[in-house]
């Protein structure tokens, strides 16, 4: 499981140093793609689960096959180097508006890389939604 937020930078070669707490799970590589206005870094086992779900949703007519085609065609497989850096392809960075400063955050089974301003906007909305869910007895606060 990936949790926590980290402020990092993308170097001039388009590489991101992964937080040390995330590296062990990605030692054998990960898939990198865009997802929900961020870059997602996904371990192979989770990416396979995502692929299976997408195949099912396409066959059930819930998701357009062309959207799935774009999702996979834009993906990249990366292996962290000895310093824990991974390459983020230019087209992925441009698609989600990443420049030098980024927020690297854990999202359960994947890592997300966000533009700091966009992440702050999403976090504000998420904080309100979480508080509302807890107040109504749903989500995290439920026992």
Locations of the language-model features?
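Flexible "stalk/tail and boundary" regions
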Residues: 1-8, 12, 22-78, 82-83, ...
């Amino acid at each position: 499981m990936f949790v926590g937020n980290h402020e990092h930078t993308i170097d001039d070669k388009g590489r991101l140093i992964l937080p040390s707490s995330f590296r062990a799970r990605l030692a054998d590589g990960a898939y990198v793609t865009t997802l929900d206005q961020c870059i997602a870094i996904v371990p192979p086992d989770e990416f396979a689960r995502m692929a299976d779900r997408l195949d099912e949703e396409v066959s059930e007519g819930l998701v357009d096959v062309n959207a799935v085609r774009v999702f996979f065609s834009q993906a990249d497989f990366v292996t962290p180097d000895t310093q824990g850096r991974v390459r983020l392809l230019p087209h992925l960075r441009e698609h989600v508006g990443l420049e030098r400063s980024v927020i690297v955050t854990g999202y359960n089974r994947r890592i997300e890389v966000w533009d700091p301003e966009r992440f702050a906007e999403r976090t504000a909305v998420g904080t309100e939604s979480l508080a509302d869910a807890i107040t109504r007895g749903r989500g995290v606060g439920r026992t």
